[in-house]
């Protein structure tokens, strides 16, 4: 599990995936979201520009990211 400390009100989902090094590029982040490989608060979510906020949980490739 990764704990990500949010700076500001939110972070777009694709930027979060890059920030915690779960993907190598923005293009890769967009592809994994589009392919339904990312879960947001336990549900598959296809929104690339999803605003992830404090208290949210993102899961990808066996790794969970808790937003604090």
Task: Explain the meaning of each model-derived region.
Residues 11-54:
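A basic, amphipathic helix-loop patch mediating RNA/tRNA/ribosome contacts
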Residues 64-68:
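Short, Lys/Arg- and Gly-enriched loop/turn segments at beta-strand edges
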């Amino acid at each position: 599990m990764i704990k990500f400390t949010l700076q500001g009100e939110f972070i777009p989902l694709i930027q979060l995936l890059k920030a915690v090094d779960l993907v190598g590029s923005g293009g890769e982040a967009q592809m994994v979201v589009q392919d339904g490989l990312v879960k947001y608060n336990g549900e598959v979510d296809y929104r690339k520009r999803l605003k992830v906020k404090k208290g949210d949980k993102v899961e990808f490739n066996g790794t969970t990211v808790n937003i604090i």
